């Protein structure tokens, strides 16, 4: 399985996440909605073929030991990803969260002026939170 093609599609389609899981069709999350890709259901062998594409030997050993690993990966010309691989009942699974190359400003995010002013306060602790 060519992970680079999957990640390229994910970025090009504007997806925030690429979800891979044994027993399921690969899916992307676009604007909060999970959308299946036009692919076959993933087998354990498919997932195992992905690991060497993104993990070095030390990371592979760590994953085998802990059955879970968090790391970052990059795809030249496309961007960076926060990655979590883990084991579940059906087998291995992984999620690639796209890290935007350009951080959006307040206007692009549609943040109201009152929240913008709060975020720019230079003393104290102000938390602006939302979905991840």
Task: Tell me what each language-model feature is.
Residues 131-132:
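The conserved Walker
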Residues 1-118, 122-127:
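N-terminal "pre-motor" subdomain/linker immediately upstream of P-loop NTPase catalytic cores
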């Amino acid at each position: 399985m060519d992970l680079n093609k999957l990640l390229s599609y994910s970025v090009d389609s504007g997806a925030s996440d690429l979800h891979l899981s044994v027993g399921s069709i690969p899916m992307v999350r676009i604007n909060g909605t999970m959308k299946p890709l036009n692919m076959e259901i993933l087998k354990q062998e498919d997932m195992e073929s992905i690991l060497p594409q993104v993990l070095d030997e030390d990371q592979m050993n760590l994953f085998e030991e802990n059955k879970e690993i968090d790391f970052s990966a990059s795809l030249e010309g496309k961007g960076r990803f926060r990655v979590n691989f883990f084991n579940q009942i059906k087998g291995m699974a992984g999620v690639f969260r796209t890290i935007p190359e350009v951080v959006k400003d307040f206007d692009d995010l549609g943040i109201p002026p009152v929240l913008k002013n709060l975020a720019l306060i230079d003393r104290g602790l102000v938390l602006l939170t939302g979905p991840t």
